[in-house]
Amino acid sequence: MSTQPMPLSLTDAKPGQGEYRVRAGSEIRALLRRFADEELPITLATPDGVSYTTCLWADDPERAVLVLSADAADARVQRLIEAEEAVAVGYLDSVKIQFDLNGLMLVHGRDASALHAQFPREIYRFQRRDGFRVRPVGHACPELQLRVSGPTDTELTLRVLDLSHGGLALFLPDDQPALPVGTSVRAARLALDPLTQVQVALRVVHVAPLKESAHGSRLGCEIEGLSGVASRTLQRYIDQTQKRRRLLAVS
């Protein structure tokens, strides 16, 4: 799943991309509302290579402001607000969403800091070609079972928030051991349902705090190793989940 932006200045987009441009205020609000409601990760990027993953905490079209989570101690946050250009990139199901960030500033609150940006006037949508990310349907959510090495080895069972053939997102409760960016897990067990389990190797590529009421963080992980059987099993689960979502949308 690539979080690399298309050409950083959206006005420089290639001919033919205009059909993916969203300018209607109601459509822009609907897209951003999904990022906030589903607590989906958004990667902020600059032309000189700064990349920072965050979540949209609030969108306020009346005040024309976006509010994104931020760690004030992270040097990348300061580089973002000092940059002349910045772009936000995220995914909604099979579509890459991208928009320019203007007026980016760091705001300090009593309990947390946040990034504020101007509400976007337009958003670009790019159809993904490298697979689909799905969120579990129903109450039986997939889980990842892994062992964390340390002074005392710890067994963790983490809920899967969404997954694709190339990666997955996990919910890490605040009271569990941290899994920082770069952590590699060579032998984890992905339980797709009570009867279906596959072995995976993965690496943590970003960590983003969720809303305070969630009491945890979202871990974005790349899948680095799948056997042929495991790959087919995972693809079958993704296909079945997509079909179930379409049926629920129609009913």
UniProtKB/Swiss-Prot annotation:
The keyword Nucleotide-binding applies. Residues 127-239 form the PilZ domain. It is found in: Bacterial flagellum basal body. InterPro entries: PilZ_domain (IPR009875), Split_barrel_FMN-bd (IPR012349), T3SS_YcgR (IPR023787), T3SS_YcgR_PilZN (IPR009926). GO terms for cellular component: bacterial-type flagellum basal body. Pfam families: PilZ, PilZN. It comes from the Bacteria. SUPFAM superfamilies: PilZ domain-like. Its main location: other. GO terms for molecular function: cyclic-di-GMP binding. One of its GO terms (biological process) is bacterial-type flagellum-dependent cell motility. The keyword Nucleotide-binding applies. Keywords: Bacterial flagellum, c-di-GMP, Nucleotide-binding. Monomer. Interacts with the flagellar basal bodies. Belongs to the YcgR family. Acts as a flagellar brake, regulating swimming and swarming in a bis-(3'-5') cyclic diguanylic acid (c-di-GMP)-dependent manner. Binds 1 c-di-GMP dimer per subunit. Increasing levels of c-di-GMP lead to decreased motility. This is Flagellar brake protein YcgR. It comes from Leptothrix cholodnii (strain ATCC 51168 / LMG 8142 / SP-6). The gene is ycgR.
